[in-house]
Amino acid sequence: MLKVEMLSTGDEVLHGQIVDTNAAWLADFFFHQGLPLSRRNTVGDNLDDLVTILRERSQHADVLIVNGGLGPTSDDLSALAAATAKGKGLVLHEAWLKEMERYFHERGRVMAPSNRKQAELPASAEFINNPVGTACGFAVQLNRCLMFFTPGVPSEFKVMVEHEILPRLRERFSLPQPPVCLRLTTFGRSESDLAQSLDTLQLPPGVTMGYRSSMPIIELKLTGPASEQQAMEKLWLDVKRVAGQSVIFEGTEGLPAQISRELQNRQFSLTLSEQFTGGLLALQLSRAGAPLLACEVVPSQEETLAQTAHWITERRANHFAGLALAVSGFENEHLNFALATPDGTFALRVRFSTTRYSLAIRQEVCAMMALNMLRRWLNGQDIASEHGWIEVVESMTLSV
């Protein structure tokens, strides 16, 4: 199997001052192309360290994706490190220099002298175009390893990987068939509870079951070779059966996006009233393009379940909305949810059975509970669902 590695560069990445989202994205993207990463390394802005690790990995990896260090400043050292590792000098790429000058001219700016550095590449390097920025990429062969050097800006990095690097890999290597990966996301059951129920299932050869916990959800993932796809799809039916009503969506699209599409398909507008969640519902749904008619965040106040239900019923009528959803304030470990629909208003009062989670996590959980309540109504299910540490203590329905 092709041995593919990644090297992230930069003091800010090494010291944890920024999250290395490029590494996470590349690992996931390459995995789904049949190119799982075998190793990831991070090195700061130090020329000797960069040269050392380039020479070291050139003896072990078939492909190395180097990210960052192609900018115009003194701490951008990737091109010089590559040239030094090969025992070569840097040469000016005249065509890219002219492209950069055009880039700045079209934007009414004068290119700074320091940008000239971005057109200096190791001698004999293969130029890689950057259609969305000033940092071109390049490729060099060092010992057994084909190395690709890419910009650190995420939008530029992703374009270069997808449109420049992956096609080159497909031309030069015989790539394996991408694996099959089936995913679903659950809400309300613990990871250990799910694992206890699912670990009894017999997996086909080469197939693995994975769990990823990210409060307030747990993702289940069945991964295996394409040759086992039929067996995996049959097993997937058992996985969904065992996970039961805790399943909130399949795939990677996310619950807000799926709710947004369902609202649009059924021509429902939605109005929101939030206290404890502080606008989190509005943020998630607006980012997914949901048909939001009106959103408000109001100061937290103690309310009975009946008060919350009547308030959101009136709000739906006043805004001529298809649906209206409310999350009350959080008082004495209790919280109200209410959903006003054409069929009536459905409300729940819940109690948190633990206090060990932070405010941010509790808000995320409550936002997910509200979204799940909406999802269940749209699917024709009862709005209440089980949750490991949240208990429904009261429910009510207001008829139309």
Curated annotation (Swiss-Prot):
CDD domains: cinA. It comes from the Bacteria. This is CinA-like protein. Belongs to the CinA family. InterPro entries: CinA (IPR050101), CinA-like_C (IPR036653), Competence-induced_CinA (IPR008135), MoaB/Mog-like_dom_sf (IPR036425), MoaB/Mog_dom (IPR001453). It holds the Pfam family MoCF_biosynth.
